[in-house]
């Protein structure tokens, strides 16, 4: 190899890019990571939950050294109206293996740590530089243009986030449709460690993950989230971009109203706002995926649409990590063959099919199922109304619970209930 040519150039030092760099560098590959932010993770925004299985496979016992916040042991799923909420609460008190747990994380700290692992293995990192173009020669990607310089590589891995302009320039991705992404806003609210543990009934490093549907996004597709960190709360909401044209409130106003909701306000009372961030996040999964493989190029992470919104949980970080690992394995195999053609790099799809694509394929119809206004208006209202009737005792003549439930179900419509229920069964 010429000293002027890297084995791989990775655009983006997020989870997919950092993991790809780590796996490649461990095997002696000459790797350069280019990050436009001032540090790894500086441009990344997420609610904050990492399912450990994918990174545990790459760095066994990573939680003992990584800057994780809390291990999630408490789950809450709330259906909200403007002034009420019906919440499903689950607590896992059983011992779980290292690959079965999940953690709340702060990406600015966690991504920086993960990139440090790649650098210690031999990868090189350049920050504060934007990649302007991907360089092609005879139809094959041979490097990138960054800050006026041409940097060459045998393969380029694009892990530059949702709405990858580089993938679009290569003709591997179409312009992102509004229906495929959502706008996410997040606040980091500081509270004493003991206060967080008291309010969420936590002990030690236990953590809580809370998702909210209905009122947080003013009845539009999306929802609110709250994750407990060690001394902060990650609070925010996500709303489908294509629905915002119908919104009666701005996203900042939605967030402010969410914070004032009686089910949320007591949890954040007395907290200090220490950070605010906004980001565009992928929502459509496989329905928005670009062409993942080209001559001399692979696409991974958010740039490849690696995200799953299942309603009851949201996954993205573990999928990005698996995609980064798959990309690295593919490049290592191609290096042995000295063949970086599209056909040779097609092995990437095989690795993905054994991991993230398997899960994404199973739930690929779910985004369309959730894109139903009743999910965020009629059903939260029905759930809260039934709960209110169940727990209200006012001395009046009792009404059988089945009649109360039927009364509220009629408001949704029995045909709608059957239609949505049948569709849900086929999707899930």
From Swiss-Prot:
The keyword Flavoprotein applies. Keywords: Electron transport, FAD, Flavoprotein, Oxidoreductase, Transport. The keyword Flavoprotein applies. It holds the Pfam family FAD_binding_3. Its cofactor is FAD. One of its GO terms (molecular function) is oxidoreductase activity. Belongs to the ETF-QO/FixC family. Could be part of an electron transfer system required for anaerobic carnitine reduction. PANTHER family: ELECTRON TRANSFER FLAVOPROTEIN-QUINONE OXIDOREDUCTASE YDIS-RELATED, PROTEIN FIXC. This is Protein FixC.
């Amino acid at each position: 190899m010429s000293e002027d040519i890297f084995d791989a150039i990775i655009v983006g030092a997020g989870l997919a890019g950092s993991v790809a760099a780590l796996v490649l560098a461990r095997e002696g590959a000459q790797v350069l990571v280019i990050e436009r932010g001032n540090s790894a993770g500086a441009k990344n925004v997420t609610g904050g939950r990492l399912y450990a299985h994918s990174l545990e496979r790459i760095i066994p016992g990573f939680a003992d050294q990584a800057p994780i916040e809390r291990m999630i042991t408490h789950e809450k799923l709330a259906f909200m109206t403007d002034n009420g909420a019906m919440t499903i609460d689950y607590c896992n008190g059983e011992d779980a293996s290292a690959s079965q747990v999940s953690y709340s994380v702060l990406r600015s700290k966690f991504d920086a740590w993960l990139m440090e692992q790649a650098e210690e293995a031999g990868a090189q990192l350049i920050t504060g530089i934007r990649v302007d173009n991907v360089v092609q020669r005879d139809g094959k990607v041979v490097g990138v243009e960054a800050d006026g310089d041409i940097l060459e590589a045998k393969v380029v891995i694009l892990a530059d986030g949702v709405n990858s302009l580089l993938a679009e320039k290569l003709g591997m991705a179409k312009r992102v449709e509004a229906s495929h992404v959502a706008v996410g806003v997040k606040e980091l609210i500081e509270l004493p460690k003991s206060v967080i543990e008291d309010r969420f009934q936590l002990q030690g490093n236990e953590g809580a993950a809370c998702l909210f549907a209905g009122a947080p996004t003013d009845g539009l597709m999306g929802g609110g989230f709250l994750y407990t960190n060690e001394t902060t709360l990650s609070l925010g909401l996500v709303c489908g971009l294509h629905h915002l044209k119908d919104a009666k409130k701005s996203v900042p106003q939605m967030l402010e109203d969410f914070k004032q909701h009686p089910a949320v306000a007591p949890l954040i009372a007395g907290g200090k706002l220490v950070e605010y961030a906004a980001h565009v996040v992928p929502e459509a999964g496989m329905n928005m995926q670009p062409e993942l493989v080209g001559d001399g190029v692979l696409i991974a992470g958010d740039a490849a649409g690696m995200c799953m919104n299942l309603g009851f949980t949201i996954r993205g970080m573990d999928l990005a990590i698996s995609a980064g690992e798959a990309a690295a394995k593919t490049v290592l195999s191609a290096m042995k063959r000295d063949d970086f053609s599209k056909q040779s790099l097609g092995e990437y799809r095989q690795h993905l099919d054994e991991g993230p694509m398997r899960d994404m394929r199973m739930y690929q119809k779910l985004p369309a199922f959730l894109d139903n206004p009743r999910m965020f208006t009629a059903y939260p209202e029905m759930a809260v109304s039934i709960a209110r009737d169940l727990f209200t005792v006012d001395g009046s003549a009792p009404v059988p619970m089945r009649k109360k439930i039927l009364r509220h179900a009629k408001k949704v419509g029995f045909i709608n209930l059957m239609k949505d229920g049948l569709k849900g069964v086929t999707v899930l």
